[in-house]
Amino acid sequence: DLKRLLAYSSIENVAIIGIGIGVGMLGLTYGNPYVAVLGFAGGILHILNHSIFKELMFFAAGSVYLKTHTRNMELLGGLMKKMPYTGLLFIVGSIAICGLPPFNGFIGEFLIYAGMIMGIPASEISLFLVLILSIAALGMVGTMAMLCFTKAAGITFLGNPRTECVEHVNEDVPRVMLIPMVILAFLAFFIGMFPQYFISIVMWPVSMLVNVDKYAANPALDEVFKNTFGLILSDFSWFFLIFFAVVAVMFIVKLIVNRKARISNTWGCGYNRLNNHVQYTGSSYANLFISTLKPLFKRVSHIKKPKELFPKEAYYELEIEDIEEAYIVKPLVMWDEKFLTKFERIQNGNIQQYILFGL
């Protein structure tokens, strides 16, 4: 479910914001203004960034649903040819949400990383261990985010149409739906290219969290946050912008030189009865990662192997059950629902009684 994937991704980004705020609190606790300001600034800036690229992703997912009437990625594929603008904007959002330059998702995470790294040299052993583990955790989160959204973008927009849900799509969504996505994509790019202006903005709420008067006499602090990090981030973004521009020019030159597209079947190891189902799915793409986390998932597979020289039927079905969700989260939710249903009598439609409850 494409939208459910985005909803779970919001939990991940809230956790990144929490890491930033936690780093800021550690900086306050241990009297390190650099760590405090960088942590709070990164966390608050990521709140803004998340509100931009996640809206873009949900708009793109809604456009896909409008045209295909399904949110199941396993039924899609090949939409890039039919919905090129939506596909491109979804990829832009995916790059931003993975924390890659030159888009805004990179900026907040960079500040959080910088805060943790700057806190390592002058920290006690307990803080040192916490920061090292936090850096490793944030790096692992970024890796899983890239795995997640390369899957989402690739399975949804690349390859060939898997079902009739995609076959009937003839054109992209109307301009009135594309314009908001273009604006959000531009904002994500603009913040990534010129982060110093937005760092100055988030310094206002950061100054309320950090006792600015205590560090006002330290001119180096102001230099670090208003100039140094902003310029470093800007240099990073310009470097990657030039890199992407060179790649784009090479791609355009290739199109001009070789305009004729060559279409051929995928090599099937001698099996020549291939169809659009014989391609990667979301489950098969994530299979290697899931296999490394066997204790957390229950895998149930159904296989019918080809036995004849010219097999007529063969299939492989895989069901993955989240053990934590099935045996911990769902029982707690069911117990919570049973408990709260006992209070249904309070909701009787009487406004006067509701006012009395408020009083």
Task: State the predicted function of each range.
Residues 101-106, 139-164, 187-213:
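Transmembrane-helix bundle segments that line or gate the permeation/cavity pathway
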Residues 197-241, 252-359:
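Aromatic-capped, Gly/Pro-kinked transmembrane alpha-helices
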Residues 18-31, 98-101, 187-197:
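Hydrophobic alpha-helical transmembrane segments in multi-pass integral membrane proteins
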Residues 7-17, 64-120, 128-142, 165-190, ...:
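Interfacial and helix-entry/exit segments of alpha-helical transmembrane bundles
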Residues 54-58, 131-170, 233-264:
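Predominantly late transmembrane helices and immediately cytosolic-facing juxtamembrane segments
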Residues 74-81, 115, 155-159, 291, ...:
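Short amphipathic alpha-helical coupling elements at transmembrane boundaries
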Residues 2-72:
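Alpha-helical multi-pass transmembrane bundles of energy-transducing inner-membrane proteins
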Residues 36-38, 119-134, 217-238:
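Membrane-interface segments at the starts/ends of alpha-helical transmembrane spans
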